[in-house]
Regions:
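Metal-dependent amide/peptide-bond hydrolase catalytic core
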Residues: 2-234, 240, 244
Length: 246
């Protein structure tokens, strides 16, 4: 299976700020901004939001079921995805809205209780899920926490069809007879958000034939982020043919 991005999640990066009464760290203190913020952050980080099966991911799961003979329960798709190995972490993020705390900031000295504390959260919502995601956030963050959008941009989605898709299929099969391109939703973000506003349909086509034992998803923004040379060479050949014929 070769993944082709036909959708990507929306961006909702936010700063959460809690206020409290500043004071001396040695005193009894029941109005602590750090504590209030951490409670909200812990709720966000420990809550797995409900599964939402969008059209691209339904097509992806159908392809996985057919290719690997795996029976997939639409209500519990992650149980089947776990059998796919490391890629399940990336694909699993495309089955629900997510909100991951990434940064914390509070105080300036060990013995001073700060008046404010803030956290940065990387939020991502599925296509058609923006309002529901904001409702979910409000319930988890709770009262007494201010939310400020740092980056907020739309989710996008298109269908897996048309002349470009036909050329992707042909280019892949020229290098791999058994290639089967399948659509999926990208949990990250690309320029598709901007191009979509211009009326352009966008596909993410980065053909790589990866070694089966490579935990490729773990390399994204990780230590020694890289692509195997053989995989890159394969992709160059496929993209060259695609661009010449598209």
């Amino acid at each position: 299976l070769y993944l082709v991005q036909t959708a990507e999640k929306g961006l909702a990066w936010m700063r959460l700020t809690a206020g409290g009464k500043p004071g001396h760290g040695s005193f009894v203190h029941d109005d602590n901004a750090v504590t209030r913020l951490c409670e909200a952050v812990a709720r966000l980080g420990s809550t797995r939001l409900p599964t939402v099966l969008t059209p691209p991911m339904r097509q992806f799961l159908d392809a996985v079921s057919d290719a690997y003979g795996i029976e997939i329960d639409p209500d519990e798709p992650e149980e089947a995805l776990a059998r796919l190995g490391s890629i399940s972490r990336m694909i699993g993020a495309a089955l629900r809205n997510t909100a991951n705390p990434t940064m914390l900031d509070a105080g300036y000295k060990a013995n001073v209780i700060p008046g404010t504390a803030s956290a940065t959260v990387d939020g991502r919502f599925l296509y058609g899920q923006q309002e529901e995601f904001e409702r979910q956030l409000a319930g988890l963050i709770g009262e007494g926490i201010q939310r400020e959008w740092l980056v907020h941009d739309q989710a996008v989605e298109t269908t897996f069809d048309g002349p470009l898709v036909d050329q992707m299929v042909a280019a892949l099969k020229s290098e791999d007879d058994g290639a089967r391109p399948v659509p999926f939703t990208m949990s990250g973000g690309t320029d598709a958000k901007s191009f979509e506003r211009l009326g352009m349909r966008c596909f993410g086509f980065s053909p790589l034939r990866l070694p089966p034992d490579l935990d490729f998803a773990s390399l994204f923004h990780g230590i020694d982020e890289r692509v195997p040379v053989e995989s890159l060479q394969f992709g160059i050949r496929v993209l060259d043919r695609f661009l010449r014929n598209a």
